[in-house]
């Protein structure tokens, strides 16, 4: 796992040493940031179900103004902190260790956000609610992105328009505005 582009290009990130985390592949992360390239500079980025922090750190490397990571697992939150330090981004990367459902119900540091990304476990049962609650963290004109299993039909929460879905192998990215 590495940072693909930007100021930290090529930097290797620490990976989890336990089962249960599914880091986004470098290929899918590259696809995501190719799509976001015109929006990322100066953006406020929210990474929900952050895992290793690789997506938030990629955003910072490519010019995002700041990133907030929400992660419930204490080991993963510690890993995000280690990776942010490795990338010299600890000062621009806020880590919230809390249950996602609770964290999204209150204003988060660094928000409102221009880009909100959710990468829940593929068997997560509350996609509709998670996407809808994450959307409340959006700045005006901001977007919400959901990474999910390509076999799953993406949710259509009230107040959001599904604008695009991109599939790569077993994974998909669905964009909402």
What are these regions (language model features)?
Residues 1-177:
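Class I S-adenosyl-L-methionine-dependent methyltransferase catalytic core
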């Amino acid at each position: 796992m590495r940072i693909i582009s930007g100021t930290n290009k090529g930097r290797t990130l620490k990976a989890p040493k336990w089962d249960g985390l599914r880091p986004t592949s470098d290929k899918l992360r590259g696809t995501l940031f190719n799509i976001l390239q015109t929006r990322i500079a100066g953006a406020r980025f929210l990474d929900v179900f952050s895992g290793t922090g690789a997506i938030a750190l990629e955003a910072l490397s490519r010019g995002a103004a700041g990133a907030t990571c929400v992660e419930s697992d204490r080991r993963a939150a510690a890993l995000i902190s280690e990776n942010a330090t490795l990338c010299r981004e600890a000062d621009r990367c806020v880590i919230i260790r809390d249950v996602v459902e609770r964290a999204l119900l209150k204003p988060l540091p660094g928000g409102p956000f221009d880009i909100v990304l959710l990468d829940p476990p593929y068997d997560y049962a509350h996609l509709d609610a998670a996407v809808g609650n994450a959307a409340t963290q959006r700045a005006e004109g901001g977007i919400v992105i959901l990474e999910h299993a390509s076999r799953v039909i993406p949710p259509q929460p009230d107040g959001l328009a599904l604008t695009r879905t991109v599939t790569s192998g077993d994974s998909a990215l669905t964009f909402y505005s």
